[in-house]
């Protein structure tokens, strides 16, 4: 390889790196402040000292619009803490996904207050590469157990999207 070809290749690589670093610097993060409400139903099965719970429902929130949600969690019955995963699905097929950690407390017979902190790990469509955190703060009505329980609450937090 002659010196001229080597110089040309190095110059091309340097130009590519400059373009890539410039485009990354031009990308900006758009933060969406989310405030909304939701209603849903949950079911679960007790296994040993845990409750394997699944929930789903629908809601509407600022900056993201109407959504449906699915939550799968393992609840430690000794301390009412939970861990799991969630999906928020939008009418056009876009998705936000992530993990959750929660804590519940009984507020009355057949009722509980549950707060779940959601960590956004990504998404699809307009939420591709999304990060951030959301909070499900809900009241659960267990008067229809063992068939299911009803819940309603608020969704708050921030979604960060790279544009």
Regions found by a protein language model. Give the residues of each.
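Bacterial N-terminal signal peptides
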Residues: 12-22
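Bacterial N-terminal signal peptides that target proteins for export
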Residues: 2-13
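Compositionally biased, intrinsically disordered low-complexity regions used as flexible
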Residues: 1-2, 110
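Beta-strand-enriched cores of mature, soluble protein domains
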Residues: 26-163
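General helical secondary-structure elements
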Residues: 5-6, 24-26
């Amino acid at each position: 390889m002659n010196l001229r070809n080597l110089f040309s290749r190095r110059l091309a690589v340097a130009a590519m790196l400059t373009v890539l670093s410039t485009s990354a610097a031009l990308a900006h993060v758009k933060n969406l402040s989310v405030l909304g409400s939701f209603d849903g139903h949950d079911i679960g099965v007790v296994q040993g000292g845990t409750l394997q719970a699944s929930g789903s429902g629908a809601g509407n929130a600022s900056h993201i619009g109407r959504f449906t949600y699915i939550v799968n969690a393992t609840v430690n019955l000794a301390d009412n803490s939970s861990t799991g995963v969630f999906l928020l699905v939008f009418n056009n097929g876009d998705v936000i996904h992530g993990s959750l950690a929660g804590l519940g407390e009984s507020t009355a017979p057949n009722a509980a207050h549950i707060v779940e902190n959601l960590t956004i790990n990504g998404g699809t469509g307009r939420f591709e590469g999304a990060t951030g955190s959301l909070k499900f703060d809900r009241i659960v009505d267990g008067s229809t157990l063992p068939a299911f329980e009803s819940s309603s609450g608020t969704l708050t937090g921030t979604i960060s999207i790279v544009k």
